[in-house]
Amino acid sequence: MRIHPTAIVSDKAQLADDVYVGPYSIIGDNVVVAAGSRIGAHCVVEGNVRIGKACEVFTGVVLGSRPQDLKYKGEASFLEIGDNNIIREYCTFNPGTAEGGKTVVGNNNLFMAYSHVAHDCTVGSLCVIANNGTLAGHVNIEDSAVVGGLVAIHQFVNVGRLSIIGGCSKVVQDIPPYSTCDGHPARIYGLNLVGLRRNHIDKEAIGQLKHAFKILFNSGLLVKHALGKVKKEIEQTPEVSYLVNFIANSQRGISRSCRQLD
């Protein structure tokens, strides 16, 4: 281990042999840091926190501090961070609230400076949370989603995989997979074509998704009727099936379209 002489690292913390801890950082008793990870200067990692392999934690990050929720009374809760995550300056991640509750972050994510992951959130893998992106409690971000800068996401919202949220948006309802959305409140603008192509979704599948989006967001039908029409008229490719199931299972409702979809 390479621990700067000004850092304070608990004897009870479990750090892999090659972990680096920078100046003036504080590592608490129940912290586990896996091989290849780096903790920058002036960081605080406290509580029940597990950090995976090859993570980069930059200056001023605070991981595992008490959840910002009035119902929390000191229960043992957890923060679990996977491998190859980049957590930039002054980000804050809180653990769960209930006894045994967890905030869970997957692998290969980028959290830009000042972003916040609140209690009981789940972030998948290959996501980007841009500067000052704010996830309230119990938010779920699926794989390969992009959250723009200064976005605020309401409690319990689900953000579907391969979706992208424009900067400064206010998100109060679920964001469907594969969508592009923006606004205050956020509204659907169409498919995230760039994201779909970058993830090697073929043209036929994209065409089926376009058809599904027109029915779901441009037909004027009630959601349950639009879902029935999609199931009846469109081939249930894996992408279409995932979209249908996501919308059918939404608890907060789905963000609606702001205009006619092409």
Give the positions of each predicted feature.
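Terminal amphipathic alpha-helical/low-complexity segments used for targeting or macromolecular assembly
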Residues: 1-6, 11-12, 17-18, 54, ...
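Structural signal for interior beta-strand "rungs" in well-ordered beta-sheet cores
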Residues: 2-187
